[in-house]
Amino acid sequence: MADSEHRAADDGGAGAAGAPRTAGVVGLGLIGGSFARAYRAAGWRVLAFDTDADTFDAACVETVAGGLDESTIPLCDIIVLAANPAACVEWLRTHAEALGACSDPAAGTGPLVIDTAGVKARVCDEAFDIARTHGFAFCGTHPMAGTEHSGFAHSTATLFQGQPMVLVPPPLDDIERLMLLDRTKELLEPCGFGKFSVTDAATHDRVIGFTSQLCHVVSNAYVKSPTAQEHHGFSAGSYKDLTRVAHLNPRMWSELMVANADNLVFELDTIIGNLGAYRDALAAGDTGELEGLLAEGDRIKRALDDAADGQGNR
C-alpha cells in the first residue's frame, strides 16, 4: 500500500462526514498522471490503473493510494479515462455493469466517468450508448493542455491550471444536461481549469483537426527538410515555435488522426492549396502577389487576436 493512502486528506478533498473524495484514473501518462497529481494535491484519494506495472508502482510512491478495479469503482466520485480512444471504449464495455450497479444518474450518485481522448466521436458515439444502457453518468471531455513530453514522469499537478476544457455531454433533455454539466465542472474543480466550452462531438473533431492535429502534422513535416540539419546557430523563436510539437507519440497521434481523417484531410488540402499560392508567387517573381498573400494572412491573424481579446481568450 502506498504511503499516500495513509496520509490524511486536507479539507479541500473532504466529502461526506469529512471522508476524502476519491478520483479514479485509467492511464497514467502525461494527462492521466497530471489528473492524478492534481486530485492528490487537492486532498483527494486517487485510485488508478495502468497497463504498465512500473508506471503504476512509480505513481504509488506519492500519488496513487491503490488500484482501480470493479471492487473499488463504487468508491469513486469521478473516473478519468486518460487512454487512447479504443482503450477508453473497451474499459467502458468491460466495466459497464459495475458502473451501473452503483449509479443513479438522476440522483447524482455513483461515479461520473469522463474520457480525455483527443477525438470525441470515436469515443462518445459508443460511450453515450453504453452509459445510457447501463445507467451511469458519462461526459466526454478534452483538456486543452499538454507538452511535447509524455509519460507519468512529466506529469504535474498544475498542468491544467487556467487551461481551457471542452465538454461534450450526451444528448439529454435540458435539465438533465445542465445537471450533468454542473456536476462535471464541480468534480473538475481541483484541476483548476480556466474556461469551459460545451460542444458536440462532430464540432469538436472538426475544429480540433485544425487547432491541434494539423499543427502536429505541419511541425512534424517541417523538420524533415534537409536544411534542418544546419539550423543550429541560425534559429530562434520562429523555429522553436514551429517545431515544438514535431516531437510526439507516433502511435497515439496516428490513432487520433486516422479516427479524424476526414477533418484532417480537409485541413491539409486547405493548407497545401494556400502554400501552393505562395510558391507560385515566388516562382514567378511576383512581389505584388506575394505581398498581398502575406498581408492577407497578417490581417486574418490580427482579426483573430482582436476577437480573442474581446472574449478574454487570447
Model-identified regions with their sequence ranges:
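Rossmann-like NAD(P)-binding element
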Residues: 70-108, 112
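Interdomain hinge/lid region at the active-site interface
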Residues: 230-301
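Glycine-rich, N-terminal phosphate-binding loop of Rossmann-like dinucleotide-binding domains
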Residues: 82-84, 117, 169
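Internal alpha-helical scaffold of NAD(P)-dependent oxidoreductase catalytic cores
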Residues: 157-244
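Rossmann-like NAD(P)(H) cofactor-binding subdomain of soluble oxidoreductases
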Residues: 94-153
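Phosphate-coordination loops involved in phosphoryl transfer and adenosine-cofactor binding
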Residues: 19-22, 110, 162
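NAD(P)+-binding Rossmann beta1-loop-alpha1 motif at the extreme N-terminus of oxidoreductases
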Residues: 2-74, 78
